[in-house]
Amino acid sequence: MSNSLLTQPTQESVQQIFARIAPQYDDLNTFLSFGQHHIWKAMAVKWSGVSPGDRLLDVCCGSGDLAFQGAKVVGTRGKVVGLDFCAELLAIAAGKHKSKYAHLPMQWLQGDALALPFSDNEFDGATMGYGLRNVGNIPQALTELQRVLKPGKKVAILDFHQPGNALAANFQRWYLANVVVPMAKQWRLTEEYAYLQPSLDRFPTGPKQVQFALEVGFAKAVHYPIAAGLMGVLVAEK
């Protein structure tokens, strides 16, 4: 993998990266988040505003952890649709669904976050976990989320955040470079995870994400820093 690919990967190369890391994806997510990602994902589901019986869309669903959190809330009368561009991660999600959550109505689709295969005004809520940073066009991804939501409904988008505090920012950079990447080396995935810091450097700040959301048609948008500012959740209402 070239240095240029690490700093500005194409969507095809990002898809290939996730295909390669799929077998270790859950373990590395737990390590990346200090074991807290399940809590943050539950917070995102709560901020999405869904309730029992609702239809929830989880975009960039990966191995399904955020979708499963949503399925527990919407229950057997509702439905969760998980969409991702990586077939390998979707297979893991489907396997977990079958073994642990078979009683909950869920559907897994391979698709593009920039061209969602759904009708306008179809969902009661939407979530996205650690996906917005990896799409090729953030405003277009937000446009599609706004389109498929019913009027008055919300999307909650969890991702890394660039801390305003210099100490937290330095810790985040040190942790990625000196803990996460060396751990990934154990699975021979050093280059795959080395793209994390460049992707974070390119990722819009919370206020910029809010601006994008409002520009594409959301009526309201707020960005909440969490985990000492190391993570953030963008909540936008149609």
UniProtKB/Swiss-Prot annotation:
Keywords, comma-separated and alphabetical: Methyltransferase, S-adenosyl-L-methionine, Transferase
Annotated disulfide bonds: none
Domain of life: Bacteria
E.C. number(s) listed in UniProt: 2.1.1.329
Catalytic reaction equation(s): demethylphylloquinol + S-adenosyl-L-methionine = phylloquinol + S-adenosyl-L-homocysteine + H(+)
Molecular function terms from GO: 2-phytyl-1,4-naphthoquinone methyltransferase activity; methyltransferase activity
Protein's GO biological process: methylation; phylloquinone biosynthetic process
Pathway membership, UniProt: Cofactor biosynthesis; phylloquinone biosynthesis
Class of this enzyme: transferase
Pfam families the UniProt entry points to: Ubie_methyltran
Function as written in the Swiss-Prot or TrEMBL entry: Methyltransferase required for the conversion of 2-phytyl-1,4-beta-naphthoquinol to phylloquinol.
Similarity comment: family membership: Belongs to the class I-like SAM-binding methyltransferase superfamily. MenG/UbiE family.
HAMAP family from the UniProt entry: MenG_phylloquinone_subfam, MenG_UbiE_methyltr
Record-given protein name: 2-phytyl-1,4-naphtoquinone methyltransferase
Species in which this protein is naturally found: Synechocystis sp. (strain ATCC 27184 / PCC 6803 / Kazusa)
